[in-house]
Amino acid sequence: MANRIMLNETSSHGAGAIKEIATEAKARAFKKAFVCSDPDLIKFGVTKKVTDILDENGLAYEIYSDIKANPTIENVQHGVEAFKKADADYIVAIGGGSSMDTSKAIGIIIANPEFEDVRSLEGVAPTTKPCVPIIAVPTTAGTAAEVTINYVITDVERKRKFVCVDPHDMPVIAVVDPDMMSSMPKGLTASTGMDALTHAIEGYTTKAAWEMTDMFHIKALEIIGKSLRSAVANEKEGREGMALGQYIAGMGFSNVGLGIAHSMAHTLGAVYDTPHGVACAMMLPIVMEYNADCTGEKYREIARALGVKGVDDMSVEEYRKAAVDAVQKLSVDVGIPTKLEALKEEDLQFLAESAHADACAPGNPKDASVEDLKELFRKLM
């Protein structure tokens, strides 16, 4: 099967990039925006940075704020009805993965109403029409949802998250402005940054990886490795580096998939409401150890990209350990816990079965059974 790369039609990067929103909307003759943003971003004036630009340019909009972390089926259903009432013709998604994922689901269902039950879009979605046009404006440096063909929805009733993979949901325009991320608190910067690191490592080692995506992932690792600590310290250079690094990781993994660190993180988020980036960060070193013997020399390049010295003189065992240790140290340095106190022995079977069924699991470089996944989860206890 041929390899493919799917990206935004247009992406703008750097401080002040949000000014391009008006330019892009006018160029496409958009008439009214459905601004999708969460209540906290509205409360702290982050959303206003974008709506001010729309106001200055005479562009109509309506704000929708029924967004929650780990968006649910109900959030999507409410959003679809709100979009219809707004009489909008495009979406401006402002926020982290939650706003982006909600926006994608809304846009897909509006364009493909036969899939009004979002559960029917799980896995590789069978839609036939492009999503309502989305201008994606990330406010976190991690999910890269602005440049991916994936979104994740929580099924509260069944205590699970499900992944929808659909080329039709790619935002037409991504506006990646580090100034939109400057208000992120330390903990959120750390967790979303570790999500980006997990994207880069899982995308680099997944079964579908190839030369072009390898290029993206290694460059992303180099940038994230030298930027995340300073971003958590709220240094401008670190913020700018993470804004770019997480986007580059998205350019890669969206086209080749991920692995069991993500499938397990999705399950932890659904059952315990663990923040996604925290769950990824806790699982990543554990999963890297499990995958090590199925990754060729890639851990040497991971270690090198993360700043480990002398990797060319290391044995296979040494550079594999060095890569895992570098990831673990970065995670600890930015304040991520290594254990999950909420995890219960009686939950392990359900967690493992859910992770095994997750859409990310087949891409893992090493096959993992339900029993394997139970043992990996147990290492968090």
Model region roles, listed by residue range:
Residues 18-21, 43-46, 73-76, 98-103, ...:
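Short glycine/serine/threonine-rich phosphate/pyrophosphate-binding segments
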Residues 74-179:
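Glycine/threonine-rich beta-strand-loop-alpha-helix active-site module
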Residues 271-347:
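Gly/Pro-rich interdomain helix-loop hinge
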Residues 42-115, 229-239:
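N-terminal small/polar loop signature for handling phosphorylated ligands or for N-terminal nucleophile
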